[in-house]
Amino acid sequence: MITDLPKDLIEEILSRVSMTSMRVVRLTCKSWNTLSNSESFKKMHIGKVTSTREGESRVIMLIDYNLFLMSAVLMDDVDPSIEFKGKLSCLKEQVKISQVFHCEGLLLCILKDDTRIVVWNPYRQETRWIIPRYSHRPYVMNNIRYALGYENNKSGRSLKLLRFIDYCYTEKHICWHEIYDFDSDLWTTLDVTPHWYILSNWSCVQGVSLKGNTYWCAREENSDGYNHIICFDFTRERFGPLLPLPVNVIDNEYEYVTSSCVREGKIAALFQHNDSYPYELEIWITTKIEAEMVSWNKFLRIDIEPNNNIMVPFIYGGFFIDEEKKKVALGFDEEFGRKTFNIIGEDGYFREFDRITFNIIEEAGERAGVNCGSYVCSYVPSLVRIKKPAQGKRKRQSSLEKLRFDQNTWIFDSIYQATASQIRRRRPTR
């Protein structure tokens, strides 16, 4: 029997098990559960699961409220491939995830009903559940943004969660920014008076995590185009200045911009037209980026003649690139409800994957609504631990924070009541 083998040999055998199958290993027997949770085994196992073939990237996909692990290989001498590794199901209970945010191996998952948030390390199978102080109404879900970040201090890495809503009501810019500290287990309202708008969460457009901070595409308050990015610094707990994107969206007649993280601490920006002119896109990559400065370099431009019978897919929900191979894996094209995964490159290279996506959707079950588009991002497993709430008596919120919270809840309760009344008046009477 395998249990009679030496411990070192069992460790070597089990370390070859894929990340998505480790839950089965832990449930097999008590000794395997103990072994697989030891730090020595985790270091051995993560070394194997993070090793990849040349041109291979691990990818997390959000499809119809479920998360999946994929492998994408982008090579020059062979056709690219997309391999389904399995559904990520480390959570003890089945939940429906409407948004996901990736931060260095940790996943911030927003549930469908927006009543709970879970921060999750799929590799360590560690979670921390967080209850928002205030539950917003379903019709403003796309105006709520989330980000996970951290600051480095003497005791190590301190995780923080940013949650904010930008809402235009009767031509007024209403916002509420709050931050959750994992160490204190407290929410705090931030003093933010924005002169900008951050790109909304349509089709799961998310911020990009880089070195503990988060970057979003943004525009000036009285501007039409999203021509900037803006950084939230989790150490100083404040937004930086608007930083220029390399392409002026309006002047170059681009309608949409999407950002993504690139290996080695870079951000990529993808500019594209809408469906009316699907023949052109540009991708730029940062050469230097900090909270208050940025510089860019053009990575790839696709410009196809309309009579070639090839259209650049309109991309929803993220992308990732292989900088060396000059290839881009372009998330999902969801035209007419048909989800396809696309890879493009230099010299008109184009490859579309369809069947594998349909297989995933069939397994996923429930089809997502408007608050859950498809989303893709690169992923590297991490040994970072998620700190549990301190035991004992919880710290009390300050009187000033209680006042700020009461003021914001009164404002949004009033807005939602007025909006609900308007909706009722618009409904036809029978």
Swiss-Prot record:
Q: Which residues form the F-box domain?
A: 1-44
Kelch repeats span 161-207, 312-363, 383-430
Domain of life, per UniProt, equals Eukaryota
Q: Which residues form a coiled coil?
A: none
Q: Which SUPFAM superfamilies match?
A: F-box domain, Galactose oxidase, central domain
Give the matching Pfam families.
F-box, FBA_1
- Keywords noted in UniProt: Kelch repeat, Repeat
Q: Has keyword Repeat?
A: yes
Record bears the keyword Repeat: yes
Q: What is this protein called?
A: F-box/kelch-repeat protein At4g33290
Record the organism.
Arabidopsis thaliana
